[in-house]
Regions:
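Beta-strand-enriched, solvent-exposed domains that form extended recognition/catalytic surfaces
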Residues: 18, 22-157
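Binuclear metal-dependent phosphoesterase catalytic core
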Residues: 32-56, 61, 377-378, 382-447
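His/acidic metal-ligating clusters that form di-metal
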Residues: 63, 85-87, 99-100, 207-219, ...
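N-terminal active-site segment of His-dependent metallophosphoesterases
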Residues: 70-74, 139-231
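Acidic/histidine-rich helix-loop elements
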Residues: 99-101, 170-204, 262-274, 299-304, ...
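Extended active-site neighborhood of metal-dependent phosphoesterases/phosphodiesterases
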Residues: 133-158, 232-319, 343-355, 364-365, ...
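Active-site-proximal beta-strand elements of phosphoester/diester hydrolases
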Residues: 163-176, 287-297, 325-329, 390-396, ...
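Active-site glycine-centered loops adjacent to acidic/histidine catalytic or metal-binding residues
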Residues: 171, 224-225, 257-258, 329, ...
Length: 447
């Protein structure tokens, strides 16, 4: 038993209410490896320094990003403008100190500052060539957001002993050729540049590489939509990339998403990963259980069939108090269903949403349920007023917001943070994919 794990809320989620130090040494500068934009010969015009985001806050670090570009004309991807990267940071009641000043011209700017103090409030100023970066996305424009007040508070670790870290990633879409809602010739999706056509592979590879080299090689839950259409070559490539990270069930587990649903005559995903509507249970050496369920039905919404309910109930009833991370590709709350731009028909059917929440409520150990599918980062409200389980939608890997989350577990609670990979090519693609759905998509994906 791991007492106290259920007693703390999630911290550090990527959304506007995450704002809550200066010990500035050492400083790790992700912008040193950030990309120069793909379009290198650009008329400067009027530079806009925008899309300011406090991406990640931990007890001892923060990641801040922004872009430089021309003013947007029409509905296409705006021209990037290259500029330098400067970040000043200091205690909220003290002077700002320059922690990074890199004149290398680039359009996507990202700086990670480490060596901060837990539970301390900092202020910052991000600039490029003397112009201050400003927020542009709806969640970052909320009153009191980190980006509006240019302040953040580092997190305080939960009490108790550190147990383990689990990485969460989803919506990879290997085999996909355009990002966004594809509606014929309408500009609702983003066409990758010729050297970005394999962007799903790029984003997964970059994430797995960061997890190996920068984040301690944690166990990874790859939570659905791993392929675009469950084609044999897509499944084979996905398996190859994951096998490069480690062994199935020992280093990673893969669930099925709606894009991975069985085809009419075959099921390549089932042949290589796991059969249709099969529950998977992973016991971490720390004692934490991962309950990986299959919520898929067809190409959109989802369900849970009776046989899988039997598997789920048998597992939970065998040890109801064991600390358990539950995952499905589809979100399982009504709030998620009714706030998604795709609507409730794109979600798990209503009866299954309620039944899963009831089952999890009967098992005191289920402290968190993580889903993907919507491509956004969002905490959801449980439908049961007395629920002890918390619910989270994790952002997509394949495109903007683009990355993975780390769930750090302690005996007294947990921390959860979103991270973007550090690969320069990944940054190039994030700059471009931010403009999916005619630029509206990014406003809907950050909480």
């Amino acid at each position: 038993m791991l007492p106290g794990l259920l007693g703390r809320h999630a911290h550090g989620l990527y959304r506007a209410d995450r704002c809550s130090a200066v010990c500035l040494d050492p400083v790790s500068l992700l912008s040193e490896i950030a990309p120069e934009p793909i379009l290198k010969s650009i008329a400067r015009g009027r530079m806009v320094v925008t899309d300011l985001e406090v991406i990640t806050i931990t007890p001892t670090s923060a990641v801040i990003a922004w872009t430089t570009r021309q003013s947007r004309l029409g509905v296409g991807v705006p021209q990037p403008v290259t500029a330098g990267t400067e970040l000043a940071l200091g205690p909220v009641n003290g002077p700002l100190r320059t922690v990074h000043d890199d004149p290398t011209p680039r359009a996507f700017h990202m700086v990670e500052v480490t060596g901060l103090e837990p539970g301390r409030r900092y202020r910052f100023k991000a600039t490029s060539d003397g112009q201050q970066a400003h927020a542009a996305l709806l969640p970052t424009l909320q009153v009191g957001s980190c980006e509006q007040i240019n302040e953040f508070t580092t997190l305080t670790p939960p009490p108790g002993e550190y147990l383990t870290t689990i990485a969460l990633t989803n919506d990879i879409h290997i085999g996909e050729k355009r990002q966004g809602i594809v509606l014929g010739s309408l500009p609702t999706s983003v066409q990758p540049h010729p050297d970005q056509v394999d962007y799903p592979q790029l984003m997964l590879s970059a994430s797995l590489d960061d997890l190996t080299t920068r984040r301690g090689h944690p166990f990874v839950v790859v939570n659905g939509d791993i392929t675009y259409a469950n084609l044999p070559d897509e499944v084979e490539l996905a398996r190859q990339l994951l096998d490069g990270y480690g062994e199935q069930d020992a280093d990673w587990v893969a669930t099925r998403g709606n894009h991975d649903h069985p085809r009419r005559d075959d099921d390549p995903f089932g042949d290589v990963f796991v059969g249709y509507q099969r529950n998977q249970t992973i016991l971490d050496p720390s004692g934490v259980r991962v309950l990986a369920m299959d919520s898929t039905r067809g190409s959109g919404g989802g369900w849970i069939v009776p046989d899988q309910y039997d598997q789920i109930m048998s597992e939970l009833e065998s040890d109801p108090h064991r600390p358990t991370l539950a995952v499905t590709h589809h979100p399982v709350t009504n709030e998620a269903a009714w706030t998604s731009i795709s609507g409730p028909q794109f979600m798990l059917r209503a009866s299954d949403r309620l039944r899963l929440q009831l089952l999890e409520n009967q098992a005191p150990g289920v402290f968190l349920h993580v889903a993907g599918h919507t491509h956004r980062m969002r905490r959801d409200r449980a439908d049961l007023l007395w629920a002890h389980t918390q619910y989270l939608e994790n952002a997509a890997c394949a495109a903007y917001p683009g990355g993975f989350s780390l769930l750090h577990l302690y005996t007294g609670g947990y921390l959860l943070n979103f991270w973007r990979p550090s690969d320069p090519d990944a940054h190039d693609w994030l700059y471009r994919s931010r403009w999916q759905v005619m630029g509206l998509g990014a406003h809907l994906m950050l909480g």
